[in-house]
Curated annotation (Swiss-Prot):
Keywords: Acetylation, Autophagy, Biological rhythms, Cytoplasm, Isopeptide bond, Phosphoprotein, Protein transport, Transport, Ubl conjugation, Ubl conjugation pathway. Widely expressed. It comes from Rattus norvegicus (Rat). The lineage of its organism: Eukaryota, Metazoa, Chordata, Craniata, Vertebrata. This is Ubiquitin-like modifier-activating enzyme ATG7. One of its GO terms (molecular function) is Atg12 activating enzyme activity. One of its GO terms (biological process) is dendrite arborization. The keyword Transport applies. A motif (FAP motif) lies at residues 11-13. Belongs to the ATG7 family. GO terms for cellular component: axon; axoneme; cytoplasm; dopaminergic synapse; membrane; perinuclear region of cytoplasm; phagophore assembly site; presynapse.
């Protein structure tokens, strides 16, 4: 038992100081890396011995806590810890805190017994952090523990704490500062958690713990040590001293009767360094009977009410609302990767730049679904204004947008996207798209305007990754199809009937530097099995576009049409279905390693192993709402296509707007003559006449 006449040493426990950056980094780690993994993780904190008077003893964790190689802040001492992050609040509450403390304490005890703590004294200052992160509410529950081994009896004070300036002269204090700094530089560290020191009238010497036998050679009464002390109390040392005294009692109680402890505190105020507020005292070193069993340990932090329990931090109120929205938008997407689709590459989807040609019913629904997938860059092109019939079918508009003649759709749609989610980069262009069969040569003004529209469209397609064709008329899709095919851009097309729709990806032409016989991009196409469909295993560069099934060139489809024929009359739910499928098709294409060159999946592939983590990658999806049915046809590129055939693309790339102006200002026969459709019609008619002649002779 200790001497009842001596006062007992008491210690100031650590207070956890978890920075907002730590919680942000934990959120990112949980979403992107840990997911459902509850295995312990190594983290790193630090404590500082230069705080002003009145501040508590703090162990700080910042955003860099998860990077074990991150540098420790200047003049701070690192502390290694273990993070136990649970998946549910119930698991957090029912975690065996006693077992966690015992396991960590046993690691410290083993380091003491083996001598590893002498080689690496940081092993004495381990900590635990038990957490649960509610990422929907941004509530973070945690319980901090800094394990401290308990000696069999209290530690009696032989000489009570006094200021360093009462024990050492100014010359000795200056020598101590220089000796400590030199040792830190020699070891390449910002601070030493523990060090040996001895002093006489003229000199002060310091050394590492592992050199104690040489440093105190011949001395058998008193051990003098320095402890990097984060405490500011004048009569009590900080928590790091506790485990060191257990180490000293275990290893040196047979050689030394007492320990003189310097609680080294190093403060800079008004540019002047001061260590005189450090305290120095002497304690009796208790004898510690040899035992292989780990001593009892304490260390769980009390909560804000002073009781034994966890703490909770609510960061939802102090976070930037825009950043909070951005994190929340990504939450559901990242949760897909935890269990359902662990191979999903979200970066490919989020970073894609999408150009929506058409801001009507299809355009609005496509835009909302793109935002649901986390796409951050959306551009609208449309020349119409919002009418009173639009808001009920087009969810980006409201009644006020129709007043005063109506706002331009493209600009209003972009503005509404930014109101829905400020993190989206949305823009709108109020412009017309020149079309075949719609002349632009009425005057120099109209011709020049058409030229500017074409140049603007070329720039937009060139600066985006995926082009959505969502317009009302067939001919309005021709020019973007040609430009996108020439620039090798992925095109997703959606078109509506009354109760039918088609969603398709255009075939992606080979890179221009490849020869006609090269496969694209690098993988051979698997041969079709005998007896399989004629359209099996068709690679992306052989797939047709929206116009490849036509045997006539596009023209003015609005001429001589009644009102019900001019407007897109379709069942109200059709655009929502088609718009969603268009975006999902894009995402599936992006997830395929070949991208737009992916082999097309057909209806025959529905029972086969899907090519991507999200399933099939079809060429077309044709839906029939009257039967609630979809089919996945595949069609080959047509060598006489009026939009994507080599003849059309060559003319466009060679002549540019000159060629396009001929298409706009001429009848459909111009494109048909160019591509060979006219000759095909003539040959077909000749064959029919020949068949009739044969029948007449019979």
């Amino acid at each position: 038992m200790g001497d009842p006449g001596l006062s007992k040493l008491q210690f100031a426990p650590f207070n956890s100081a978890l920075d907002v950056g730590f919680w942000h980094e934990l959120t990112q780690k949980k979403l992107n890396e840990y997911r459902l993994d509850e295995a312990p993780k190594d983290i790193k904190g630090y404590y500082y011995n230069g705080d002003s008077a009145g501040l508590p003893t703090r162990l700080t964790l910042e955003f860099s806590a998860f990077d074990m190689s991150a540098p420790t802040p200047a003049r701070c001492c690192p502390a290694m810890g273990t993070l136990h992050n649970t998946n549910t609040l119930e698991a957090f509450k029912t975690a065996d805190k006693k077992l966690l403390l015992e396991q960590s304490a046993n690691e410290i005890w083993e380091a003491i017994k083996s001598g590893a703590a002498l080689e690496n004294p940081m092993l004495l200052n381990k900590f635990l952090l038990l957490t649960f992160a509610d990422l929907k509410k941004y509530h973070f529950y945690y319980w901090f523990c800094c394990p401290a081994l308990c000696l069999p009896e209290s530690i009696p004070l032989i000489r009570g704490p006094v200021g360093l300036d009462q024990r050492l002269s100014p010359k000795q204090i200056q020598a101590l500062e220089h000796a400590y700094d030199d040792l830190c530089r020699t070891e390449g560290v910002t601070a030493l958690p523990y060090f040996l020191f001895k002093y006489d009238d003229d000199t002060v010497l310091v050394s590492l713990l592992k050199h104690y036998s040489d440093f105190f050679q011949g001395q058998r009464t008193k051990l003098t040590v320095g402890v990097y002390d984060p405490c500011n109390l004048t009569q009590h040392p900080g928590w790091p001293l506790r485990n060191f005294l257990v180490l000293a009692a275990h290893r040196w109680s047979g050689s030394f009767q007492s320990v003189e402890v310097l609680c080294f505190r190093d403060r800079t105020m008004q540019g002047a360094r001061d260590v005189t507020h450090s305290i120095i005292f002497e304690v009796k070193l208790p004898e510690m009977a040899f035992s292989p069993d780990c001593p009892k340990a304490v260390g769980w932090e009390k909560n804000q009410k002073g009781g034994m329990g966890p703490r909770m931090v609510n960061l939802s109120g102090c976070m930037d609302p825009k950043r909070l929205a951005e994190s929340s938008v990504d939450l559901n997407l990242k949760l897909m990767c935890w269990r359902l689709v662990p191979t999903l590459d979200l970066d490919k989807v989020v970073s894609v730049k999408c150009l929506l040609l058409g801001a009507g019913t299809l355009g609005c629904n496509v835009a909302r679904t793109l935002m649901g997938w986390g796409v951050r860059h959306v551009t609208f092109v449309d020349n119409a204004k919002i009418s009173y019939s639009n808001p009920v079918r087009q969810p980006l508009y409201e009644f006020e947008d129709c007043l005063g003649g109506g706002k331009p759709k493209a600009l209003a749609a972009a503005e509404r996207l930014q109101k829905i989610f400020p993190g989206v980069n949305a823009s709108g262009f109020n412009m017309s798209i020149p079309m075949p069969g719609h002349p632009v040569n009425f005057s120099d003004v109209t011709m020049e305007q058409a030229r500017r529209d074409v140049e603007q469209l070329e720039e937009l397609i060139d600066s985006h990754d995926v082009i959505f064709l969502l317009m009302d008329t067939r001919e309005s899709r021709w020019l973007p199809t040609v430009i996108a095919a020439s620039k090798r851009k992925l095109v997703i097309n959606a078109a509506l009937g009354f109760d039918t729709f088609v969603v398709m990806r255009h075939g992606l032409k080979k890179p221009k530097q490849q020869g006609a016989g090269d496969l694209c991009p690098s993988h051979l196409v698997a041969p079709a099995d005998l007896g399989s469909s004629l359209f099996a295993n068709i690679p992306g560069y052989k797939l047709g576009c929206y116009f490849c099934n036509d045997v006539v060139a596009p023209g003015d489809s609005t001429r001589d049409r009644t009102l019900d024929q001019q407007c897109t009359v379709s069942r109200p739910g059709l655009a929502v279905i088609a718009g969603a499928l268009a975006v999902e098709l894009m995402v599936s294409v992006l997830q395929h390693p070949e991208g737009g060159y992916a082999i097309a999946s057909s209806s025959d592939d529905r029972m086969n192993e899907p090519p991507t983590s999200l399933g099939l990658v079809p060429h077309q999806i044709r839906g029939f709402l009257s039967r609630f049915d979809n089919v996945l046809p595949v069609s080959l590129a047509f060598d006489k296509c009026t939009a994507c055939s080599s003849k059309v693309l060559d003319q466009y790339e060679q002549e540019g707007f000159t060629f396009l102006a001929k298409v706009f200002n001429s009848s459909h026969s111009f494109l048909e003559d160019l591509t060979g459709l006219t000759l095909l019609h003539q040959e077909t008619q000749a064959a029919e006449i020949w068949d009739m002649s044969d029948e007449e002779t019979v």
